[in-house]
A protein has these predicted regions:
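Blade-level signature of beta-propeller repeat domains, shared across WD40, Kelch, NHL, RCC1
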Residues: 162-186
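Short loop/turn segments that connect beta-strands within beta-propeller blades
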Residues: 9-14, 58-63, 99-104, 142-146, ...
Length: 186
């Protein structure tokens, strides 16, 4: 029932710091431990569990952590941080999740045309891009207004898109585990 985190030296792999988050699963129903992470511009780590949360913030300087339960009936999957350092997550149960650490409130953004949020990343223009299943599609949301733009961007021939990456030119890449391809979207 402990979330274990290690910060490694990028040059040689040595362990620099260790943080253990006690009571990782206070509800006794999390079937996944820490599941992904995102580092904000200040070097702090956001991470979450699946089935449900928690959401955890680890300060990159002090290594002190804060912990919040995710909203009921949600199951965070992918995670990223926006320009304000706030975490955004794909929701395995459908939709996107945003957490405001100042107000300690959640935004749940529904995706009515697709039901399984997966990997997520935010581009330099502040748009969140999320892979989604059931049916497979690409989702686009505006992080400034916290609103859905589209949840039905087609990926012709897709099977199970699982992740998102954005290259230096701003192209969105969507790897698909069943189709064994990566889609390039602008």
């Amino acid at each position: 029932n402990i979330g274990h985190f290690e910060r490694l030296d990028g040059g040689n792999g040595d362990t620099l710091d260790v943080v253990e988050v006690i009571d990782w699963d206070t509800q006794g129903d999390t079937d996944w431990g820490p599941y992904g992470g995102a580092v904000n511009a200040d070097g702090d780590l956001w991470t979450s569990g699946r089935g449900p949360g928690p959401l955890v913030f680890i300060d990159g300087d002090t290594l002190v952590y804060d912990r919040w339960e995710t909203p009921p009936e949600t199951s965070p999957y992918g995670i990223t941080a926006d320009a304000n350092g706030h975490p955004w997550m794909g929701d395995w149960n459908g939709g996107l999740l945003h957490f405001d650490p100042t107000t300690e409130t959640w935004d749940i953004i529904d995706t009515p045309n697709t039901s399984r949020g997966r990997g997520i990343m935010i581009d330099r223009n502040g748009f969140a891009w999320m892979a989604s299943n059931n049916p497979c599609a690409l989702v686009k949301a505006d992080t400034a207004t916290r609103t859905l733009i589209r949840d039905d961007i087609e990926l012709p021939g897709c099977g199970t898109p699982v992740g998102i990456s954005i290259d230096a030119e701003g192209f969105v890449w969507v790897p698909d585990q069943d189709a064994s391809v990566a889609f390039k979207v602008h």
